[in-house]
Amino acid sequence: MQKIVDIERKIGTEVSERTFFNLIGGFLGYGFIINMIMVATLGDYARHINMVIFLIAYFVSCFIGSVLINKTDNAFVSFIGYNLLVLPIGLLLASALPNYNIKDISFAFFTTGLVTLGMIIISNIKPKVFRKMGTGLFVSLLLLILVECIFLLFGVHQGFTNYIACAIFSLYIGYDWVKANDSYKSLGNSILMAASLYLDIVNLFLRILNIKSSDD
């Protein structure tokens, strides 16, 4: 789930650049800590949820969360929207991660961290390149989802699509980081940017995990 960030959205009181990026880091850390707690405590519960009900609730929650984050003028409502992304993704991770061994999870975790750091550094060096990627990345992601749905329907192995997804989400991290630098610095926009980066990083982590586990 990705979105194009409106960098002209001037909502709320402007904060300093340092405070803005500290807020982004704080919200990202909050989301990942909540996810880790859910994985550690809700694994058995998550695996016994009816899959149809879970998927419906997952997509509804993520959709409402995205709408709240993007459309509201209230930072508190944006934070509620952020939680509507973090919590269902936490349940998804709690259900999925027990199927992988700890070695693969650790590899995916550290690799994701290194890629994230690398993309932030590169996007700081070449921001103009990443500013031009928005439409291309969005279209590429939509095409990837379409191809994967078709492959799933016909039972085609999708291993190579994980590599394409890794490239897309890695570039999205750089793109969203540049958007954060260009955006109006406010509490509401820090939640918006944290949500975008959170989705990029989680998706990248899961794709790397799939690649690593399939190689074992």
Residue ranges of model-derived segments:
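A hydrophobic alpha-helical transmembrane-helix feature that marks the membrane cores
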Residues: 1-216
